[in-house]
């Protein structure tokens, strides 16, 4: 049986490992200026926001995310508009490498991952090949294509 102190130390150690991995990923992706993702939010609904994502000016996919709100509600609010660095790291939740947005004010762990509606996101961006007012569709292939393009650009940078 582990003592509470050992559990705290183990948790702290795991947190430090994650921070170290993020810092390594951030450093390896510095000065990668050949990639610009631009999200144009064009449909704002009470519970979700839909938009169009382009890579270097070329349409890539549609995005579903939480609603844009004047005040953040945990797990129900889209990230603020802004410029963010993106890295690809292992997601503990999804058990695979996914894009991660860094330095999003008042948010942590903002990923780009598959899903269809705001019920599948807690601030994250959900890609899809098609959409309607309820969300995005063909999310898995759209996400996989997007990850390949991001990875290629980061590796070429």
For each predicted feature, which ranges?
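Short, Lys/Arg-enriched N-terminal segments with co-localized hydrophobic residues
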Residues: 2, 7-30
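Cell wall/extracellular polymer interaction/catalysis modules
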Residues: 22-157
């Amino acid at each position: 049986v582990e003592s509470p102190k050992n559990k705290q130390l183990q948790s702290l150690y795991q947190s430090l490992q994650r921070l170290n991995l993020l810092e390594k990923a951030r450093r390896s992706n510095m000065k990668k200026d050949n990639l610009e993702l631009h999200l144009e939010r064009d449909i704002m609904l009470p519970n979700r926001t839909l938009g169009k994502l382009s890579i270097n000016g070329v349409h890539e996919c549609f995005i579903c995310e939480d609603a844009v709100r004047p005040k953040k509600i945990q797990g129900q609010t889209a990230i603020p508009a802004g410029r963010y660095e993106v890295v690809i790291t292992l997601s503990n939740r999804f058990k695979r490498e996914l894009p991660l947005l860094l330095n999003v004010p008042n948010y942590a762990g903002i990923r780009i991952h598959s899903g269809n509606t705001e019920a599948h996101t807690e601030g994250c961006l959900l890609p899809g090949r098609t959409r309607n007012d309820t969300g995005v569709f063909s999310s898995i292939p759209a996400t996989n294509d997007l990850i390949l393009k991001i990875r290629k650009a980061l590796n070429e940078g």
